[in-house]
């Protein structure tokens, strides 16, 4: 899957109320990706108005500050049943 561009997480806008990162798309809309999806390993932000996607560059540890800004705790891993 090819992406339109690679964007650093610091260059995106974080919206604490929706826990979503956005970045301007050339079509006039915005690429979107949810904080929890990034925590789960997703790194592709999609524009809801066109077919473009961007690759978001981040380290999982970077997400802690955004959870703090949103006033929520990061998801806890689910323990496997023995």
Swiss-Prot record:
GO biological process, one term: protein histidyl modification to diphthamide
UniProt cross-references to Pfam families, sorted A to Z: Zn_ribbon_CSL
Keywords: Cytoplasm, Iron, Metal-binding, Nucleus, Oxidoreductase
GO molecular function: 2-(3-amino-3-carboxypropyl)histidine synthase activity; ferrous iron binding; iron chaperone activity; oxidoreductase activity, acting on iron-sulfur proteins as donors; zinc ion binding
GO cellular component, one term: cytosol
Similarity comment text for this entry: Belongs to the DPH3 family.
Protein name listed in UniProt: Diphthamide biosynthesis protein 3
């Amino acid at each position: 899957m090819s992406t339109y561009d690679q964007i650093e997480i610091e260059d995106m806008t974080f919206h604490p109320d929706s826990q979503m990162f956005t970045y301007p798309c050339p079509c006039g809309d915005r690429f979107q990706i949810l904080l929890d999806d990034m925590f789960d390993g997703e790194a592709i932000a999609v524009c809801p108005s066109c077919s473009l996607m961007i690759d978001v560059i981040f380290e999982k540890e970077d997400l802690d500050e955004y959870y703090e800004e949103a006033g929520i705790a990061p998801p806890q891993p689910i323990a496997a049943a023995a």
